[in-house]
Amino acid sequence: DQAIQKFFVGDGQKLYDAITDNGGGQEDAMSDNKAIVPLDVSKIKNWKNLISEYNEGNVAANTIRNRKGEIVGVPYISNADSMAYNKSKVGGDIDTWDALFDSQFKGYAAMQNDSGPTLTTTAVYLKESGKQDIVNPSDMSKSEVKGVCQFLIDMKKKGQFRTFWDGFGNGVDLLASEEVLVSSCWEPIAVIAAKKGADIHYGTMKEGHQTWNNVWMLTKGGKQRGQEDNFYKLMDLYLSPWFGARTLANLGFTPQMTGVNEYVDANPSDFDANTKAVIAQRLKNKSDRMAVKGNSWQNLYPKELRAYQ
């Protein structure tokens, strides 16, 4: 892992005061190796705005805490990754991952070229549809990983996938050009592809989704250099409705703070009626996705990581 190598073998501690990465394992690895330090959240005035999912015992609580229970991360974006689809071309809305593997879209389907999200998403589908016995899609056994991989290999051999997209721009281009009609992808890819003119929608899959977040962490080197107070000031920005409203409206990321609707209503010059409607619909869609029981949180370090790789 590049982040780990940079801080434990390279010169990361000298170069960086803060680091951002996925919550769901990275915060533990960085904390175990003393690359980051516990946070004094009383110095982050907007911490009170943090959504309840991060309260102790709730679904995302562990993604900002180390194994000792200390808070070491500040979340600033999150999402439940789903499927983008070209509604006018496929003939309606889609609410199941089954479409990604349906022969009617043979040669027009795409997935991410990344073993983590692609294997987890496929595992969620196979588990919830009863096609494979899987205990935890985010932490599969070797045999479970093998079964998921074999399913994808069989699909690839049949010509189901147009490609496996690499990077944000590639994901956007495939949808915007209509070279691909259904794709597992990040929501911002669907948002930008739609802005380019294609009838791209982002669905809620009845089987579930891979959920994730990104968190900011204060490095040991940053604290030693006296940057702790500056870090907390920056975190206030990331936990402000100003930031949450804009990342939601422009990219589709889930705000990590309360008060976004109130902020939007109080700033009509920044958010016209159409933008307000988009924000309201996206918030509803996100609530619907997060309510699906088959959701599985991203795990950067499954026990059988080598099998995934």
Task: Enumerate the predicted regions with their spans.
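Early extracytoplasmic/lumenal segment of secretory-pathway proteins
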Residues: D1-D32
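A ligand-binding cleft/hinge motif common to bilobed small-molecule-binding domains
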Residues: G25-A29, S184-D199
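Paired acidic/hydrophobic, glycine-rich loop segments that form the ligand-binding mouth/hinge
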Residues: K14-D21, F164, L181-W186, H201-Y202
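C-terminal capping/gating helix-and-loop segments adjacent to ligand/active sites or protein-protein/ligand interfaces
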Residues: F243-Q309
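Periplasmic-binding protein-like
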Residues: V145-M155, K196-K220
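Short beta-strand->loop
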Residues: V37-N49, G73, A198-Q210, G221-G222
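A bilobed periplasmic-binding-protein/Venus flytrap-type ligand-binding module shared by bacterial periplasmic
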Residues: S82-K89, V124-Y125, N213-Q227, R246-N250
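Extracytoplasmic ligand-binding site segments that recognize negatively charged/polar headgroups
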Residues: G23-N170
